């Protein structure tokens, strides 16, 4: 198998003017739009899409062609389980190439994605499953036992689960206003509440163009879980603009030393991190010498940095 094609990008950010951006920017929302087509299928097959590192140290390079084929295979599997346009697909998986492909597969079917972190407690997951009533729950062997004999159909996947499935799939032609994603609130004032987002919602995330200044082929890393907007949008947004996603599959919770080591070894240039993660990493006194970085841009959100 040929190796995915890497691209180099300049280290210095472009000079962006807020006033000029406001003057020149125009919202462009086509009538027909699908996240999977815009984020995944438009890229050249040979181009590098993701570098995934497991906490064991294993590293995988994944091309766009591999993600395109894998998402089509998953779409065929979901279709065989009765998933149709407008249905909901729940996903409880760690951040892996297979997980991203399952996201795209869901959107190619015209279904709604409900992604939940493997770090969620059982009660939180049960509430979301009960409230969303998904057609299928997708998980892995490490988490399957958490769901027992739940009424929802369960699909357990791994790296080899769709080897013999066809990679040909005709994606549904969706409207930009068709529902695509179901996010849940944090539940600070009662039970978490579901909020439906249409396919067009990703077009609103222009921060990756104007704040992160994403350049084609740039090494990007987002630290958020792929279960909330601040985790999934930093996956999809940079990909739309041609970045290479560097994904770290943690063992358990956030470890600032392991995170800084990952960023340093892979020479990540563009990062989205929560204020909590930034404070945790800054608490390491000798971080600059132990973990030299190549950051071009680091962005954060959610609360003030201090």
Question: In which residue ranges do the predicted regions lie?
Answer:
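N-lobe entry segment of adenylate-forming
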Residues: 1-62, 66-79, 142, 151
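Conserved pre-ATP/AMP-binding loop-to-beta segment of ANL
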Residues: 46-48, 166-184, 191, 198, ...
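Conserved AMP-binding A3 loop
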Residues: 60-65, 180-204
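Structural core segment of the AMP-binding/adenylate-forming
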Residues: 80, 101-165, 169-172
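ATP-dependent adenylate-forming carboxylate-activation enzymes
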Residues: 93-94, 102, 111-130, 141-144, ...
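Adenylate-forming
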Residues: 94, 139-147, 250-252, 268-306
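Conserved AMP-binding/adenylation subdomain of ANL enzymes
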Residues: 203-222, 227-269, 279, 283-284
